[in-house]
Regions:
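Bacterial N-terminal signal peptides that target proteins for export
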Residues: 1-12
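N-terminal leader/targeting pre-sequences
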Residues: 3, 18, 22-186
Length: 186
């Protein structure tokens, strides 16, 4: 009986380790954020995890205040960034975290301090960097990340009354964790 109990605990521990560990070939991506004049205003590093995609958002020179941040459906960033299409929404859900099942590209607002600089990490469990999956940001026309002038109200369809698009970055592949020493993007 003691052997079975020990075997069960070892099996459970192995299963948990497999579920929560990051594979060595984790997919990485990056988006260089630029404003409408083409000036760099930040970067978004994306890393595939077992729980979804971890986005590390670093901005500098963005107007202080609350700004909507979304993954958009098209990998184009021609000013004024309407070329990025609507929010990434492969499942055709309504917009907003307050609507139940939100767009896959719906994200929490960014709260930019008076310095205009922010570094924050956000997990999006609704998207993937794995090509061929229905919720992959690497579909036929790619994807972009967009910062809006105003906050997302988390409910108004289709875009949360977030206002104009003030910064945009095309999501591009940047290898795997194995190519950067097995570490998350910096």
């Amino acid at each position: 009986m003691r052997i079975l109990k020990s075997l069960g605990m070892v099996s459970a521990a192995a299963l948990l380790a497999a579920v929560f560990s990051l594979p060595a070939s984790a997919e990485l991506a990056n988006a260089a954020l630029k404003d409408k004049s083409g000036k760099p205003v930040g970067d978004v590093d994306l890393m595939q995890t077992p729980a979804g995609v971890l986005l590390k958002i670093s901005v500098k020179g963005v107007e202080p205040g609350e700004h909507a941040f979304h993954v958009h459906a098209v990998g184009k960033c021609d000013a004024p960034f309407e070329s990025a299409g609507g929010h990434f929404n492969p499942d055709n859900h309504k917009h907003g975290m307050m609507s139940g099942a939100a767009h896959a590209g719906d994200m929490p607002n960014l709260h930019i301090p008076q310095s205009g600089e922010l570094v924050v990490e956000i997990l999006n469990p609704a998207i993937t960097l794995v090509k061929g999956k229905p919720n992959s940001v690497f579909d036929a026309d790619g994807s972009a990340v967009v910062i809006h002038a105003k906050a997302d109200d988390y409910k108004s369809d289709p875009a949360g009354n977030a206002g104009e698009r003030i910064a945009c970055g095309i999501v591009s592949e940047s290898g795997s964790a194995a190519t950067v020493g097995g570490q998350a993007p910096k």
